[in-house]
Amino acid sequence: MRRVLAGVGVVAAALLAGSWLRPVTAQEGANTPAFYTEKVRPILQTNCGKCHFDVNHKGGLSLMTKASTLKGGRDGVVIVPGDPANSVLVKLIRHEGPPDDPKPMPPKSPMISDADIAVIEQWVKAGAAMPNDPAQ
């Protein structure tokens, strides 16, 4: 009888613990500065760095810091946190810019891979979290 009760206790404890624990979804992981540092920044540096990192800020857009990225460039804001469909950056890397001035990005280079675009969309949808310090 004690073994049965002990077994029931173990099962009950496992079920109770399981109700508090849940897997972290990909979307939740994307809302952290670490996701930006590990996944997004390398994509941006590889594909956008020549024109929008370091001392180059074509179109007035610098992707170096959180503040400058969220500020946008001469044409306005490029990222709407939580809304990839209305984020100009997402539209341009998908080559879906406005018909009168499409600005496909990166210019004169192959289109960013679908997998990398999906990472950027996921990051923007999750709120576009970035570290405050670009060195992080």
Which residues fall in each region the model found?
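Aromatic- and Gly/Pro-enriched helix-to-coil junctions and flexible linker segments
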Residues: 4-5, 17-136
